[in-house]
Amino acid sequence: MNFDNFTIKSQEAIQKAVEIVRNHNEQSIEPVHLLKGILQVGESLTSYLFQKLGVNAGLLNNQVDREIESLPKVNGGEPYLSREANDALQKAIDYSNKLGDQFVALEAMLMGLFLVKSPASAFMKDAGITEKELGAAIDELRKGLSLIHI
């Protein structure tokens, strides 16, 4: 996967997910790690979107933390993307293309995570988020703008 096509903030969220995996002695980067990275790096973005969607961000964050703590621990080895995390990032790329973007922004990563079955998407769905409402909130946030290189 070419991370050069991800915005700086998206790259930071992925890097944060890698740090979380290392700090917890885990090996695979799961969607829940990516969601935690987005929550930490894109706090203003997620705050806006979750407020629009009526989501209790604190509760969602706590669920994410509990899930991360429950994952298996290992010693050694380099972190790698799990199949679900890879699928979520591919969905984010597809969503970005649909929006006419050249770069994958945090909100596209959030949509990608929502679209791939995992604990991360289950937490968002349990919080009351739907694909249609998330898409509408993203559209409102972006006001029709695209991320293209000029």
Task: Go through each PLM region and give its residues.
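Histone-fold recognition with a strong bias for associated Lys/Arg-rich disordered tails
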Residues: 1-147
